[in-house]
Amino acid sequence: MRALTVQRVKFAMDLPLLKRAGQDLAEKTKNFVSRSLVIGEVLSMADMATGVKCGIIYWLFGGAIRNLGSPEHVTKWFQPLQEQKYTGMFAMTERGHGSNARGIQTEATFDLSAQEFVIDTPCENAEKMYIGNAMYGNYAAVFAQLIIDGRSQGPHCFIVPVRDENGSLYPGVTAIDMMYKEGLHGVDNGILIFDKVRIPRENLLDKFGSVAPDGQYHSPIRNKSARFNAMLAALTPSRLAVAFQAMGAMKLGLTIAIRYSHSRRQFGPKTKEEVKIIEHQTQTLRLMPHLATALALTFVSRYAGALLDEDVFQGKELVNSRSLQALVAGLKAYSTWENIRCLQDCRECTGGMGYMMENRISGLKCDTDVFATFEGDDVVMLQVVGRELLAQYTKQYEEKPLFGLLQNWAESVGDKLRTSFLAFNMDTVDDLAFLLKAVKFRERVLQRGLVARIYYKVKTKKEDFFHAWNSCLHHVASLSLAHTHRVTLEQFSLAVKSCPDQEDQTLLMKFCLLYGTKLVFQERAWYLEHKYLTPMASTRIRNQERC
């Protein structure tokens, strides 16, 4: 399986379309991010292992070179990568540190006399784990603590040779095959251990931090934490690529399940032909909301891709686009979780046929389950969103205290009016305006609630921020998902309005309403608790979802 995947990667990257996409990546031409994301989605639909392995080599390893290196690094390393003269891997995660990448323990100690970095794995917890392409790759983009004169400058990325052109490991490098996994059997994941491996000083990807020949460290960002944030922000496109791959799996699973549901017949009126199983209400209720969600995620992900394109094309540093980073983090979590739920329903809705590997749904389930934790654990991704929303809320008070207070008062009064008995007949539950107002209301209330909780714990109870934040994580997750839901529904509605074909627009509007109804229906207890819905309105929403 692995050898076949290697052949497929080589074949795919030789295709003119993908060669052109690689050139666009190198040159950062307009809309290159969006094009690459869609290509990755389609490639993953054809074979998930091939799509993921291409992503490891070109998005992660290649992305590290493009986004963390200098123009000289791009010329030296990325162009030969495009020409398939070698392959690479991305080595950040360690046995002891995954989500908290700042705590990685691999060391890169600068040797002044030799003008080299010494890459070393000082302990078992510092072993690089789950590294894709570990058993085939020639070079690794290794994140390690940069140490000069015994002092760490924080994590930096280094290009480390792993194998020669014949596939033999270089001295000091150990690669251990992690063997069998739940899925992605075509991807070779392994453990990397470095025993004082020496690399040239120039192999440091130095966009955000460099070491001069005299051993002096220079960086445009003085704060270590801010510097590492900038490095992680530069890798944002690869996180969005996972969302696109998850959507590809959703779309493929739904296509198979819905087509099967239109061909399979079970039960029916006496003396008449059995009906298609899609005509059974439970089958429709399980599949159609997932289809609506897949459409919604398609439009909002394209929106995020367009924003990324614009920033990259204009040469902006992604670290300064915090709201975009938060959006991508939220979409990564939301899309991968929805994919898992969707494929499980697709499997069940196709019965025994869905369990057969030849029909692909069970394979997609196994292959994409890991999406919930790689490229950022989904729960941690929600914290990225929550921190940005908290920062946005506090910023408006710091910059314009009076305006912030007035805005908060106006929103609070407006929310109270919306939850009064006078408000319930203003909008009908089957109207898109009602659904948009509902998801905005939920996000706004949860945001105010989180701010109040954090303020009380830090200012009144004198707790440190970490413990205050940690005790509010459930609220953070709820707010972050509410924010992602709101943006997704808004982008879906905008896409529907801009659809040029009337017939397509009418059909898309039905799915947009279904998606919005799903969002409100699944949180109906919260809306009832906050008196945004009456029991009668909740019943109408339930009936609407069943139509």
From Swiss-Prot:
It holds the Pfam family ACOX. Its EC number is 1.3.3.-. One of its GO terms (cellular component) is peroxisomal matrix. One of its GO terms (biological process) is fatty acid beta-oxidation using acyl-CoA oxidase. Its cofactor is FAD. Keywords: FAD, Flavoprotein, Oxidoreductase. GO terms for molecular function: acyl-CoA oxidase activity; FAD binding; fatty acid binding; flavin adenine dinucleotide binding. FAD binds at residues 350-355. Gene3D superfamilies: Butyryl-CoA Dehydrogenase, subunit A, domain 2, Butyryl-CoA Dehydrogenase, subunit A, domain 3. It comes from the Eukaryota. It is an enzyme of class 1 (oxidoreductase). Belongs to the acyl-CoA oxidase family. This is Acyl-coenzyme A oxidase-like protein. The lineage of its organism: Eukaryota, Metazoa, Chordata, Craniata, Vertebrata. The gene is ACOXL.
